[in-house]
């Protein structure tokens, strides 16, 4: 609703007598309109430029979460940022994409002083497009926990530094919160759910990995079998960035990327990769930037899927001799590195 329309409605309502039945209706419409405007005005943008973030640093309700390693954080960081390294948001070594349990995540977000009223801004190094996946994965995790006021610093610390904005090396500690999150299952695709989806073919399965993974020419070191989900299409995670950077493109450009990709916004969509990292970028693009309402992330992704003892359906699985060659390559890299 436009401000002009609201103004005209207000004039009409004020012209009604106090006992006119329309008076109450008008008041209700105006209140709902104001609430809608207020919610839209307060809603956090999914992406913030360095200048936009700098303008918010004096706000006590803004919490900058630096997910780089402790050494990088200690050297220099955005003033006021707290450190929560990316690894603390991830699963175990044998299934790093696994969403940690609620008790662990509760302790983590409470230690950062997060509550629904805090605007959390996730910051990674900004090294490249792959690095953006870390910010997107933490953003997704926070949203899964019920937090709504969320943003990612577009371009990360590299963009902040390039902009010549201030940094310091003062470690920041914040008061813990008592926030008790709950898992929003509408954002999470489980392996069990995906088994049914693959069988029925009623969901769009988007593989965010580079083409050599999708085609089965290689695999993640923790995966058992190369290949992809049966029925999946490939939308590489780095399509959403200015070439050679971790700077996410404009919404208009993102719409063009989506239009040229095998993305069907009318279908429920599941984003996956090896460990739910690159997939988080595609989820972020579709759900948060483009506003698609029916996008889930399969956190365990191909590492979890390929290890299932029941041998779940896969496509682009190479021949046994080719798999042995891939295994030999991993062995050589590990042995002679």
Identify the residue ranges that each predicted region occupies.
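Rhodanese-like catalytic fold shared by cysteine-dependent sulfurtransferases
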Residues: 41-63, 70-204, 208-337
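Positively charged n-region of N-terminal signal peptides that target proteins for export
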Residues: 17-27
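N-terminal signal peptide c-region/cleavage motif recognized by signal peptidases
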Residues: 36-39
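Sec-dependent N-terminal signal peptides
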Residues: 26-34
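Positively charged, low-complexity intrinsically disordered regions
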Residues: 8-10, 25
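Intrinsic-disorder-associated, low-complexity terminal segments enriched in Asp/Asn/His/Tyr and depleted
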Residues: 6-8, 20
């Amino acid at each position: 609703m436009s401000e002009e329309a609201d103004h005209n409605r207000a004039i009409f309502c004020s012209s009604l007598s106090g006992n006119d039945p329309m008076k109450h209706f008008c008041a209700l419409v105006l209140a709902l309109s104001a609430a809608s405007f207020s919610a839209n005005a307060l809603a956090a943008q999914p992406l913030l430029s360095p200048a936009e973030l700098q303008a918010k640093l004096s706000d006590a309700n803004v919490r900058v979460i630096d997910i780089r390693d402790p050494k990088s954080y200690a050297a220099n960081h955005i003033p006021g940022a707290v450190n929560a390294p990316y690894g603390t948001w991830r699963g175990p070594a044998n299934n790093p994409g696994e969403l940690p349990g609620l008790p662990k995540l509760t302790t983590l977000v409470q230690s950062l002083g997060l509550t629904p009223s805090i605007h959390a801004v996730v910051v990674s190094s900004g090294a490249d497009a792959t690095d953006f996946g870390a910010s997107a994965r933490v953003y997704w995790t926070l949203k899964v926990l019920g937090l709504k006021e969320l943003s990612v610093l577009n371009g990360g610390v590299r963009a902040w530094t390039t902009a010549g904005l201030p940094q310091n090396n003062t470690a920041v500690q914040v008061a813990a919160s008592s926030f008790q999150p709950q898992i929003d299952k509408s954002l999470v695709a489980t392996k069990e759910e995906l088994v049914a989806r693959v069988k029925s073919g009623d969901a769009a399965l988007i593989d965010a990995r580079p083409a050599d993974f999708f085609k089965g020419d290689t695999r993640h070191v923790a995966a058992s079998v190369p290949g992809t989900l049966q029925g999946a299409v490939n939308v590489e995670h780095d399509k959403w960035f200015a070439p050679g950077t971790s700077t996410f493109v404009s919404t208009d450009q993102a719409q063009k990327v989506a239009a040229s990709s095998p993305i069907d916004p009318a279908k429920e969509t599941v984003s996956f990769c090896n460990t739910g990292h690159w997939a988080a970028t595609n989820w972020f693009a579709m759900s948060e930037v483009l506003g698609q309402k029916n996008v889930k992330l399969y956190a365990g992704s191909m590492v979890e899927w390929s290890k299932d003892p029941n041998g779940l359906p896969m496509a682009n699985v190479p021949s046994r001799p080719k798999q042995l060659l891939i295994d030999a390559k991993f062995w050589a890299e590990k042995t002679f590195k």
